Amino acid sequence: MKTVGELELSGKRVFIRVDFNVPLDKEFRVKDDLRIRAVLPTLNKVIEKGGKAILASHLGRPKGKPSAEFSLKPVGEHLSRLIDRPVPLAPDCTGREVVERIAQMKNGDVLLLENLRFHAEEEKNDEAFSRALADLADVYVNDAFAVSHRAHASVHGMTRFARECAAGYQLENEIKYFRKAMDNPARPMAMVIGGAKVSTKIGVLEHLISRVDFLVIGGAMANTFFKAQGKEVGRSLVEDDHLETAARLLKAAAEKGVKVYLPVDAVVAPSLESCGDVQQVPVEKVPKDRLILDVGSKSIEVFESVLKNCRTIVWNGPLGAFETPPFNKGTFALAEFLGSLDALTVIGGGDSAAAVKQANMEDKVSYVSTGGGAFLEMLEGITLPGVAALEECCGRS
């Protein structure tokens, strides 16, 4: 697959599919710019080579029609401050006005198209819409790993009509680190998996059991495994319809010689709001009127004793309700510990990435993925539609 640095870009219109689907506060200011900063190497390379950078993204779920709430205007303003140059916002992502704006661009200019999802055709992967987007540019670049699991027009459809295609540096890095961690990992290898539900990660667990040496399970999903083992979990979140699944996964791991580590103690409280009535108890002694909201300190010690000898570690999903102190201690302790290791540490998007950032460990781990759903699908062994389409386009161009 070609990368953007290999192309001759001077004077060319370069359509860069980015993922600027970032959280905004009540004043419509960017709260977390990880995904914006992730595209800067690609954008700066296009500017440096004299290309005309046309940025395209979605934001939120505007349901196929324009909405001021989902305008990319605040994102463009934030990007402008990051690169210290104007980033004007086009009135739309296709149409006569957009074509005219692009025609006026000079080498090194940047233009941000308005929200792709203001058009229902984007998510429908509509052929005419895909062609209209492709007609805006001479070169198509995908630098949006986080949406590459979606067969949408700007990710999949327009590659069929693009004159030339390439991967951006962020997409290239995502694939490189993922393959380094999963295809031929330095061993021992561990997967740390957390979050709320077993049901959302069954495919991941099934795929990984034959590939890892150690599996560390935390978060609310551990409750389902506890109950499958006959343990009391109080009023904790449990997926009762997946108890057999949890038992089957534990049995499969044992048959393949994969050591599974579940928490040995838990932080419990009557509710998320009851921060003053918090206890740490062994997992065998969870009170019937309490919720498990985090792993305990002994669990962290056990997890660290396993992970310290691993050479490859992939982490996806928090160990507790980390958005609500004091139930963030387990997740933050893990983030800090992974940042201290001399191992390949790949953090898989979403809440895990947010936790690593909040713990100031972004620069200490090997790689923090920008993808949530895309990362999970790759963990399941699924080929991402956007990546497959890009590889096919690169092969033609």
Swiss-Prot record:
Give the family per the record: Belongs to the phosphoglycerate kinase family.
Pathway annotation: Carbohydrate degradation; glycolysis; pyruvate from D-glyceraldehyde 3-phosphate: step 2/5
Write down the top EC class of this protein.
transferase
Q: Which GO terms describe its cellular component?
A: cytosol
Which residues of the sequence carry a binding annotation for ATP?
Answer: 201, 323, 349-352
Subunit details for this protein?
Monomer.
Name the UniProt key words of this record, in alphabetical order.
ATP-binding, Cytoplasm, Glycolysis, Kinase, Nucleotide-binding, Transferase
> By its UniProt entry, which Pfam families does this protein fall under?
PGK
Keyword DNA-binding listed? no
Report the superkingdom from the record: Bacteria
Where it sits in the cell: the answer is:
Cytoplasm
The reply on keyword Transport is: no
Which PANTHER family would you find in this protein's record? PHOSPHOGLYCERATE KINASE, PHOSPHOGLYCERATE KINASE 1, CHLOROPLASTIC-RELATED
Show the GO MF annotations: ADP binding; ATP binding; phosphoglycerate kinase activity
Query: What is catalyzed by this enzyme?
Result: (2R)-3-phosphoglycerate + ATP = (2R)-3-phospho-glyceroyl phosphate + ADP
Q: Which species is the source of this protein?
A: Syntrophobacter fumaroxidans (strain DSM 10017 / MPOB)
This entry's Enzyme Commission designation comes to 2.7.2.3
The name this protein goes by in its record:
Phosphoglycerate kinase
Output one GO BP term.
glycolytic process
The record's PROSITE patterns line, in alphabetical order, gives: PGLYCERATE_KINASE
